[in-house]
Regions:
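C-terminal output helix
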Residues: 105-114
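The feature encodes the CheY-like receiver
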Residues: 13, 55-56, 73, 85, ...
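Binuclear metal-dependent hydrolase catalytic cores
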Residues: 120-293, 298-303, 313-314, 371-405
Length: 405
């Protein structure tokens, strides 16, 4: 891919050039923004990477010139700037930028960010895959021991976090190391059981001025999402209250329905779990990701088996590119856990097949399961799908593992 870098900082140009060249791209560059359009017309790159603040012509002007020129249609423009303000990001995206990356860049993730913006891929990352309770020690060496936390990084900079189990501390470490803690994000809570909210107070970006978060989820037993989250940070339980956070934090109560979140279509579905628990479907540019945890599919011979519910949920997740779902138990473990609000392998595989799911990610593993048990669960899921003649691809993600959707 041919990429043109426009930045008046020579060191930044050299750093980005080295990374992109190593990744196999053809790279051109200039530190003179006044010559940008001349260079673009002469070379017709696939992508232009530009800073905003430059002494001759700023990056937003370059973006506008490209957008207004019909001969330059198809060139992707990515902003790489030290400006952290939402206004600049919104303005750039509104004018057609393919992505917005905030300096300083992280050499470990920079090329992947550029690739995601160019191809409009969604980056899905697992920060905690366990359920109920964190699992420290060698039993969890392969898959990790942290509880529920998953992120979606969308091509235009939207950052969605799903649940705040202990995995959110691993995410926190990553954000502090790669972004200097700077983050504006949406935090979707499935439900307020401990393994989905209790590590939120340890998410360091919440304490950084200038950051902005919206926490979204359903009320529970008539208690709003704001009250649920605030209560666990009451000074009886935790030394720092919600009112002491230095970031801006907002709350939104959701029910089953359809929402616009940062311009992204989000659908919600009430799940079969004690109390209110929401599943989420994110629809973006012809692709979708479903986050369905915690949820119980009763077996067909159970008096609680609800075919109508299964069909409605199957319709909700139908044809999704990625289904992240509760698969807490092996089939032989499930009979002693009926009614606990979690599912076993065979039923998860059957519903994924029924819904024509493209990729199935097993999630929310029981704390008593070691890595070998999760390996067995994955093998059982593959066998079940094979018997059904399914095209669904199944995997059991490990902690910090990422996928491009």
């Amino acid at each position: 891919m041919k990429i043109l870098i426009i930045d008046d900082d020579l060191l930044m140009v050299e750093a980005q050039t080295a990374l992109l060249t190593q990744a196999g791209h053809e790279v051109l560059s200039s530190t003179h923004s006044g010559k940008a359009i001349e260079l673009i017309r002469a070379h017709i790159p696939d992508c232009v990477i530009t800073d905003i603040i430059m002494p001759e012509v700023d990056g937003i002007q370059i973006l506008k010139q490209i957008s207004d020129d019909k001969q330059l249609t198809g060139i992707k423009v990515i902003i790489v700037s030290a400006k952290p303000f939402k206004f600049d990001r919104r303005q750039a995206m509104k004018m057609g930028a393919a992505g917005f990356i905030t300096k300083p860049i992280d050499p470990a993730t920079y090329c992947a960010q550029i690739q995601c913006a160019i191809t409009e891929k969604i980056k899905l990352t697992f920060w905690g895959v366990r359920g109920t309770l964190p699992v420290p020690g060698k039993r969890a060496f392969k898959y990790g021991g942290n509880t529920s936390c998953v992120t979606l990084e969308l091509p235009k900079g939207e950052f969605f976090i799903f649940d705040a189990g202990s995995g959110i501390k691993e995410l926190s470490n990553h954000i502090m190391a790669t972004r200097d803690g700077k983050l504006n994000a949406k935090i979707f809570i499935s439900h307020p059981h401990w393994d989905h909210i209790n590590a939120l107070p340890f998410f360091s970006p919440l304490y950084i001025p200038g950051n902005e978060f919206e926490i979204l989820g359903t009320s529970h037993a008539g208690i709003s999402m704001e009250s649920l989250i605030t209560a666990q940070m009451d000074d009886v339980y935790f030394p720092i209250t919600m009112h002491q956070l230095e970031s801006s934090v907002y709350f939104r109560d959701l029910t089953q329905g359809e929402y616009d979140v940062d311009g992204v279509n989000v659908k919600t579905f009430l799940l079969n779990h004690p109390g209110n628990s929401l599943g989420y479907r994110i629809n973006y540019n012809g692709r979708s990701i479903c986050y369905i945890t915690d949820n119980e599919f009763f077996l067909p011979d159970s008096p609680n088996y609800d075919l109508d519910y299964i069909n409605r949920l199957s319709e909700f997740i139908e044809d999704t590119d990625a289904l992240i779902t509760d698969c807490t138990y092996l089939d032989n473990e499930y009979p002693s856990k009926v009614g606990w609000g979690h599912s076993c392998v065979s039923q998860v595989a059957a519903v994924a097949h029924q819904a024509n799911v493209k990729n199935l990610y097993l999630f929310h593993h029981d704390p008593d399961q070691d890595d070998a048990k999760i390996d067995l669960k994955l093998a059982d899921a593959k066998m079940a799908l094979e018997k059904l003649g399914s095209k669904t691809v199944v995997s059991a993600p490990t902690e910090t593992q990422s996928f491009l959707i």
